[in-house]
Amino acid sequence: TKRIEKEMIQTIKNLLGIGPKTDYSELIKQGAIVLDVRSKGEFAGGHIKNAINIPVDQLSSSLTKLKDKNKCIVCCCASGMRSGTAKRILESNGYHAVYNAGSWYSLQSKL
């Protein structure tokens, strides 16, 4: 669909550093939740300090862990694909300030 194509293009632009930048460091300093949607095993192998781990395939059934739909959520994974899916899931469930930060490792280097 057009929406998925648009999200994929934006992910590629983000990875290449094209287009407007989001200051994830500032969002996190202001209290944004870092949501890592990789598997439990991937998360155990390394993650951003204080990140919440909810694998993307469990996100729809775990939304109660993210109670405040107005709280800023910065999603990350290994490459940006699963976090893009997580962003769409959260937005379709009424979350208002959701960002796809792409790779957790890249995000960590910006913090």
Spans of model-derived segments:
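Rhodanese-like catalytic fold shared by cysteine-dependent sulfurtransferases
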Residues: E5-A32, K40-K71, M81-L111
